[in-house]
Amino acid sequence: QYKGMDKDGKWRFTSPTHVVAAFSKALDELKEEGGVEGRYNRYKNNNLVLRKKLKEIGIESYIEEEKQSPIITTFAFPTDAFSFNEFYSFIKERGFVIYPGKLTDVDTFRIGNIGEIYEEDINKLCEIIEEYVKGMK
């Protein structure tokens, strides 16, 4: 595709108009949000709010703050009795999806902070998690 476009300014095969339109819209949305820096700041805020609220209900972030990426956050299981499968189902039934941990030395789960996710979404998720944790006790 690139060579064809570079050579004569045309698509090599049928133009992928839906892909180009989607990419154009994504660039418009990125610009509206303040560019890469604005998007990064939203992700970073999502991460800060998520870690703060979960810590308040007894779920600790696995990675220390200075090494934490704003993209996905890993949390340690709050207790030995914690069941990820039950937790996952509880959250999914309420419209959110999380991920199992990928570590071998400690039980963890992960929550993505990026995409079309805003602080109000993080707050709602944290309310659901708090409801689950209170029901465990």
Segments (PLM) and residue ranges:
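Short amphipathic alpha-helices in soluble, non-transmembrane regions
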Residues: 85-93, 124-130
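Active-site C-terminal subdomain of aminotransferase-like
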Residues: 1-52
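Flexible, glycine/charged-enriched surface loops at secondary-structure junctions
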Residues: 33-42, 58-65, 100-103, 137
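Conserved PLP cofactor-binding pocket of PLP-dependent enzymes
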Residues: 94-110
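Short amphipathic beta-strand starts and helix->beta connectors
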Residues: 54-60, 92-98
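PLP-dependent enzyme catalytic core of the Aspartate aminotransferase-like
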Residues: 108-137
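Short amphipathic alpha-helical segments
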Residues: 7, 69-73, 107-110
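Conserved PLP-binding catalytic core of the aspartate aminotransferase-like
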Residues: 60-90
